A protein has these predicted regions:
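N-terminal interaction/assembly modules
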Residues: 1-141
Length: 141
């Protein structure tokens, strides 16, 4: 598995855990870092994972606003927690990580949805992120 692929997966897991525990993502990430230092079985949290988690947290309000606006028929609180966090990660990477090709962002988000969510989730994630990708030039960051 490529390094960035692993970093995305870990960032998603941290975001998901933070929401489930009701803590901010940086707190959950600090716990992962601490665990990696004491448990050899726990992979380290890479720089790119930290960049993704911190970016999602820094832009959380705008990301959720965009997801709420463009997820037709779905409010954020009705979305499965997995989908919500895959979409948050994908939206952040799509809009704020300019060195990552948009097609890679969509593909990676769909793969996370396939691995961790429902059978319907990959199509939902792909559709919503594709819409944001189309609108990217006009969206205010």
């Amino acid at each position: 598995m490529a390094a960035r692929n692993k970093a995305r997966k870990r960032a998603f897991q941290i975001l998901f855990e933070a929401e489930q525990r009701g803590v901010d993502p940086k707190t959950a990430m600090a716990d992962w870092i601490r665990l990696a230092r004491t448990d050899d079985r726990q992979p380290p949290v890479t720089e790119y994972t930290m960049q993704l988690v911190e970016g999602c947290e820094a832009h959380a309000e705008r990301i959720d606003e965009l997801l709420s606006s463009y997820s037709v028929g779905w409010s954020l609180d009705r979305m499965p927690v997995v989908d919500r966090n895959v979409l948050r990660l994908g939206t952040y990477e799509l809009l704020w990580e300019d060195d990552v090709p948009d097609a890679v962002v969509l593909d990676e988000a769909v793969q996370l949805a396939k691995e961790f969510s429902t059978d319907e989730s990959p199509a939902f994630v792909n559709g919503l992120l594709a819409r944001l990708m189309e609108l990217k030039p006009t969206l205010k960051r």
